[in-house]
């Protein structure tokens, strides 16, 4: 199974970014990501995930994501993100690096899962 097929068939919101391009933009996303965020595919592809950040997003948690990306290591972080309509949602974000056969970084795969705040 190719990575793009995996992402599009994943049961959770998922994206692929390309760190070889300026600003590590999203190059693939699935329908669940679009449903979760309220954006269209055209609004997502080519952008860095920062468009989901808003006033309540914790800078320390964002730094955890940035540090893991810079170190090319997997990470899971819960943070407050924002949908296109401005509504916040608690998001469990998993990011993992993708390496080619020569161990060169070629991308990151990310999954997003809305975390319920109800007890």
Predicted feature residues:
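PAS and PAS-like sensory/regulatory domains
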Residues: 12, 75-77, 84, 89-93, ...
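PAS/PAS-like sensory domain cap-loop motif
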Residues: 33-44
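PAS-family sensory/regulatory domains
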Residues: 45-56
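Sensory modules in modular signal-transduction proteins
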Residues: 1-31
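Soluble sensory domains of the PAS superfamily and closely related sensory modules
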Residues: 68-73
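PAS-family sensory domains
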Residues: 19-20, 80-86, 99-101, 104-118
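Output-coupling edge of small sensory domains
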Residues: 17, 96-98, 113
């Amino acid at each position: 199974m190719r990575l793009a097929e995996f992402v599009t068939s994943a049961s959770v919101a998922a994206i692929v970014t390309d760190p070889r391009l300026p600003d590590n933009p999203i190059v693939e996303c699935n329908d669940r990501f679009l449903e979760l965020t309220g954006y269209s595919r055209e609004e997502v592809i080519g952008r860095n995930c920062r468009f989901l950040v808003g006033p309540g997003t914790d800078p320390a948690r964002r730094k955890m994501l940035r540090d893991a990306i810079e170190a090319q290591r997997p990470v899971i972080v819960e943070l407050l993100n924002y949908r296109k309509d401005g509504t916040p949602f608690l998001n469990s974000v998993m990011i993992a690096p993708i390496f080619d056969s020569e161990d060169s970084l070629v991308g990151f795969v990310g999954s997003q899962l809305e975390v319920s705040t109800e007890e």
